[in-house]
Amino acid sequence: MTDASTGVQLPLDRLLDRRAFLARTAALAATAAVGTVALPGLAGLASAAPSDTSAPAVTFNPDLDRGAAYNKPRESAMSDPTEWTISEAAWMIRHNKIVPVELVQAYLDRITAYESTYQAFNVVLAEAAVKAARQWANRPYRGPLHGIPLAIKDNYFTEGVPTTANSYLFQDFVPPYDATSVTKLVVQGGIVLGKTQMGPLATTRATLPNGQVTTVNAWTPTNPSTNPGGSSTGTATAVAGRLASSGIGTQTGGSITSPSNAQNLTGIKPTMGRVSLAGIVPLTYTRDHPGPLARDAKDAAIMLMAMAGPDPADPRSQGLPPVPNLINAATPRYDGDNLRMRWKTRIGVLPGYADGGSETAAARRAFLAEMSAIPECELVEVPFPDEWSLLTGSAFNNVRLPERSEPFMPYLRSDLRGFGVSVTSWLQGALLGANGWVTGQRAKLLLLDRILDQIFSSCDVVVQTSPVPFDIVGLPEIAFPIGFSGGGVPIGTILGGQPYAEDRPLSVVAAYQAVTDWHWRRPADPPAVGPSPTASTAAARSTAATPSRGRLTAEEVAELTQ
């Protein structure tokens, strides 16, 4: 819908009833109590597959093929295809300046040179990627993802390719179909380069199932102690280290926003249900969110538009407002040469967000100053909702644990060794009572009600210091870079948005990235050490002779679990 006076498309948050999202969240909690989460091949993953071996039909989405999706590469990046954003690579492919196989090969060359250091992937599908690139070169053009190499977190089903979730439980599972999100990306022309490392069962930073640290932060590849973020660690390192154009992860408690902030990326956790969870190894029915990790707001918008939409295989995705024009939202708006906000926007600033003398606080203050200088952007102080610390604290946050333990109970009863280093949090979930879970669901609805009434009555988006509150209630978040520490480690921040209105925070980040260059910066390459190990799964890699990067204990994983 457009504004009758200006002809400008309205943001989705101006058209929606926020209370309807509250009612839907309550219904989702009730559905979760019935027990609707199913593990792949629950009777025995080594030999059993899901009873339904066909993925839902997915068709090409022409809405992605918009003029705003294409940008000619920057002069400084013209000579290196792996420096291009999706929109830049798409411009080059669309104008016949490069063919998909050349782009894929450029990334495979970097994987050959640097993957042994980064350890971003569980498996690299080099031959399949080159074959797909050649096929796309001879097919009708599909839009900005046509021929784009992508990294897929290893909890997304990939037909005929092991999907381990970095767990002993799934080490022999080979899905018979793709996850809906993977299918949607491939239908749009995306090319799967490989499956990426992750925290075991999507818990913490990427490690082997036994806790041995694998993936490093691309900005400090020789220092494995630098936090790379988790659990979508491998996807973040692959995109930041220029081993893939973009990638996808999942978030239950910061698993997209944390690695995005840690590695100078722009990542989106969309509204609950905006992207289908069908074909993803689950954690919780009410808090799992698939989403993209990308290099800038435009790329994140392209990826999310491809992934989003209703799916018959996931009731959470049905009956939602239509996906807004995210690509336009992520395109900076200019009046002549003057940048303006796409829509008049109030950015809510919570108490203490930029206080103190830390490098992070200084970067936050600089971010707020940049935004306040953009016409039609207003900074608004907003209070914490009533009982914020209680409602967002560990007591209620931990009620997610029994929900995720429930579908794993057959494994918990039979052999705890299959859970490896992540076993503690699964046992915690199994031991928490139903009363606590029900109380937690009531607390979640109260928290959501207060966020909608006491924060979003005064602002359109809100800055955050932690992803947890909006993870609990299922509201959208976007993480993006705002600076660097003195040691050269990225500093990021998070914006939270209103239900289904991913367009508004995307427009804010696009405006900010139009006046800053943090998102353009890339880490220096590590020393090239030759071809990566041939081990194709987490289980195989655990026996490979690689230098130790330390090991997380079960207690540490329980403390850090996402």
Descriptions of predicted regions:
Residues 91-95, 108-119, 134, 138, ...:
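Sec-exported extracytoplasmic/periplasmic mature domains
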Residues 146-290, 315-319:
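Short glycine/serine-rich loop/turn segments
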Residues 97-105, 134, 356-385, 405-415, ...:
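Acyltransferase
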Residues 24-171, 201-204, 319, 524-562:
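Short, well-ordered alpha-helical
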Residues 1-20:
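N-terminal secretory signal peptides
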Residues 66-72, 269-362, 516-535, 553:
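A short helix-breaking turn/cap at a secondary-structure junction
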Residues 96, 147, 187, 191, ...:
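Glycine-rich, small-residue loops and helix-cap segments
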Residues 77, 146-165, 341-350, 391-445, ...:
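Short helix-loop capping/hinge segments that flank enzyme active sites or metal/cofactor-binding pockets
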